[in-house]
Amino acid sequence: SKNPLPTLKQMEDEPAKLLEEKANSGHAVSGKPTENQAAKSGPTNSDGELTKKIIESLCKAIIDVEPTLTKYDTVVGDGDAGETLRHCAEAVLQYLKENKIPLDRATSTVLGITEAQESSMGGTSGALYAIYLTGLVQGLLKSTQNNGEAATVKHWASAANHAFQSLGKYTPARPG
């Protein structure tokens, strides 16, 4: 039977065009928690320095794999995915260097990463990543009963599920 889910190519049609128009309008993605809300709510990072090292390691891995991502994207897309992700990773590293990403609360950390991402990625992919990361912050805020507790795998899994559901409101693309 035919798969009812859209292909990546089909994603380039109307929903992607609408997202790109919104992304290029200069407006931030709506529903983004404020810095103040994120700084006072949600789970904490149990070890800020470890969190920083993990983020740095992930960014360096993205930078290292950029040529491979670009190669694959030239086959299935327009060839800019690797460069776009590398620019984002470089922006996150710069934000870390300038202490623009708070490391005390998981929500503040993701919000700082989101700001770096929004400053470095445009177009449809930039909008989609911003929606996902904003959903991740919202999910972290919803996942905690006690604002002082450290983020656990359970918090992150719940937040990631929330982010995925948020993204699903803006794009018909689904895994598979």
Label every model-predicted segment.
Residues S1-G176:
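N-terminal loops that bind phosphate or other acidic moieties
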